[in-house]
Amino acid sequence: GVAVDYTAKTQFIFKINKGIFSARDSKRVNESVAEDKKRVPFSQMVYFGDGDTDVPCMKIVRMFGGHSIAVFNPENHAKKTSALKLKRQGRVDFAIPAKYGPQSGAFQVVCAIINKIKADYDLQHLSL
């Protein structure tokens, strides 16, 4: 396994962005890659986080046009308060209970984000 602290988490999102599959490759992640050559654009990323070590990634993904979601145990008042604070501060797009069934807020939010990503992609690739 690989230990993942907040610094490693940010490195992993850049690896995903650039299409680097090795968890141990720390050289290529710092190489410049043209936007049109990136495997997963930030604008097509959705980052879920549930703690303080996720805040840097949530902020970065959102800053580069992606979507960040703070999830929390609805029975834990402190976690809920923390997630709602991230939303108020503009660090995440959504703060929602960590429930993922088809009737949940998380399911609805993710479906809406996927539909938005697809619509943005379709608009960018129109040839009129």
Task: Give, region by region, the residue ranges found by the protein language model.
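C-terminal cap/substrate-recognition subdomain and adjoining C-terminal extension
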Residues: 1-128
